[in-house]
Amino acid sequence: SGLGRNPTNNPLGQILRLLNQNVDLIKYKGWKVLFPETHFDLEVGNNPFRNKIKNLRGEDSLKEWDKFISSVKPLSNIVNNIPLLASSPQNLNLFEGLDLARKILPNINQAFKLTKSFGYLVDENLNDPFLRNWVDLLSFLISGLPMHDTNTAAMATLFSEWFEPEAYLEYPRGGSETIVNALVQ
């Protein structure tokens, strides 16, 4: 997700914009989830997953999830306010620097968590096995690695995008080849 948004924190989306390449995207909200315990259809967005937690795991797990999401939000705010490709530290002017500081200072006491694996946040906040497996699955989908080896900034970006009310997923029409062709152009 994030290729079709402008601005976007998706590094690939930023590179495609710098290259003036547009990719035709198929947008969708739902997907099928298969777990050993159960399988279900799910839509991205905060409420569909909260409802699924409540139905599958109960109120205590929902409270645990809400606490976890609250711990991720400050990190998402930091990551979403740092321009990945928009400007280089070498040419960041004073006003851009002040604007950046204004955006990240409210959450700066949480910034050290960005240097740890995402599993660190999970270990601090989630005990429910289903929720832990869920985050491990999302980590694998983003990085190809388990949550304890996945970059926290990448996951904070995912959580800020996937759990918004207007969230959606994207797939390039024509598959990965479409992305490769756009980059080669």
Which role does the model predict for each range below?
Residues T157-Q185:
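Helical element adjacent to the flavin cofactor pocket in flavoenzyme catalytic cores
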Residues G2-R5, I108, L145, L169, ...:
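Hydrophobic alpha-helical scaffolding
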Residues P36-F40, N46-T150:
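Rossmann-like flavin
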Residues T8, L114, F118, L131, ...:
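Hydrophobic (often cysteine-bearing) scaffold residues that line and stabilize catalytic clefts
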Residues D149-F159:
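Flexible hinge/switch segments at interdomain interfaces of large molecular machines
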Residues S1-G30:
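N-terminal FAD cofactor-binding segment of flavoenzymes
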Residues W31-F35:
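Short acidic-hydrophobic surface loop/beta-edge motif
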Residues L16, V122, L183-V184:
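Structural element of the ATP-grasp superfamily
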